[in-house]
């Protein structure tokens, strides 16, 4: 048993006797500088290609966004205009009739006005029509004149022209006269 422990098995003997087998198994193959340069140039080419593709994609996204914004501006009023077409039709119909009756003509105008106000509402456009005695609001009213009145100062005495808002933004303030301070 002591002899068996002292003599290595034949497989270990072969490995120990052949140093070339030992070094190639443990160390990777050494690349020549030309091979390393070729691999690095290939990687550079791949990275440049990826960069150019990403840059082109970014430019395409930006171009499409600009086109989408231009279309949105161009056709933003389209929905509102669709609601105004029936109003225009009613006005043309009124002009083409030979209505001698003022009452019927007035009724037609009232119906057309209701159509117009409905179109305004659908387009998120609302009237600013302050009542007499309302407090003057400089954000929604424009004072044209200040007149002596029995009302409290800075209140609406009369409305000369209605104002309008679009989605809570004042399109035109209501033109009003206000009471002068006493």
Swiss-Prot record:
One of its GO terms (biological process) is protein folding. It is found in: Cytoplasm. Pfam families: GrpE. Keywords: Chaperone, Cytoplasm, Stress response. Residues 1-35 are annotated as: Disordered. Participates actively in the response to hyperosmotic and heat shock by preventing the aggregation of stress-denatured proteins, in association with DnaK and GrpE. It is the nucleotide exchange factor for DnaK and may function as a thermosensor. Unfolded proteins bind initially to DnaJ; upon interaction with the DnaJ-bound protein, DnaK hydrolyzes its bound ATP, resulting in the formation of a stable complex. GrpE releases ADP from DnaK; ATP binding to DnaK triggers the release of the substrate protein, thus completing the reaction cycle. Disulfide bonds: none annotated. Gene3D superfamilies: 3.90.20.20, Head domain of nucleotide exchange factor GrpE. This is Protein GrpE. Belongs to the GrpE family. One of its GO terms (cellular component) is cytosol. Its main location: cytoplasm. Homodimer. One of its GO terms (molecular function) is unfolded protein binding.
